[in-house]
Swiss-Prot record:
EC number: 2.7.7.87
Coiled-coil region(s): none
Ranges where the YrdC-like domain occurs: 4-185
Protein's UniProt name: Threonylcarbamoyl-AMP synthase
Reactions accelerated catalytically: L-threonine + hydrogencarbonate + ATP = L-threonylcarbamoyladenylate + diphosphate + H2O
SUPFAM superfamilies according to UniProt: YrdC/RibB
Organism: Pseudomonas entomophila (strain L48)
Amino acid sequence: MVSSWRVQQAAREVKAGAVIAYPTEAVWGLGCDPWNEDAVYRLLALKSRPVDKGLILIADNIRQFDFLFEDFPQDWIDRMSATWPGPNTWLVPHQDLLPEWVTGQHDTVALRVSDHPQVRELCALVGPLISTSCNPAGRPAAKSRLRVEQYFHNELDMVLGGALGGRKNPSLIRDLATGEVVRPG
């Protein structure tokens, strides 16, 4: 396990506009502050990912997403709460409360409360975080720090070392309003 001071250093970097790599439940992730437009566009450029596709936000606990849930039915909140923390990503209406560089051309945003200890510690310090697989578009997601370095060599501000969470597949993605599975887990 990476020492807490490294996670604190990563939090300082993110707050300063950094793009970082870190281990998640199944693959390495790239992340940054969702409110920092320059950081998000830099992350998108590193991945060669179009902004219109949208990005996932991860958090330490469901309360970090409360600003989005004000008008949600209680059963929606209960449904998400029953699956978090864990490998479940929900597409929820963003109600124009998030910037376009996060949501892309969608009326929904993807949210997950991670169960990876380092990710949770980092999000507890910085709030919700952009999280996307650590790979250039069209390449397999990094499953090792070596692959992270091969993909992005000196282009990242920080690589937070640590172990993956042991899951074989990325998270399940479901639409909160319809229950439809968008991506199997």
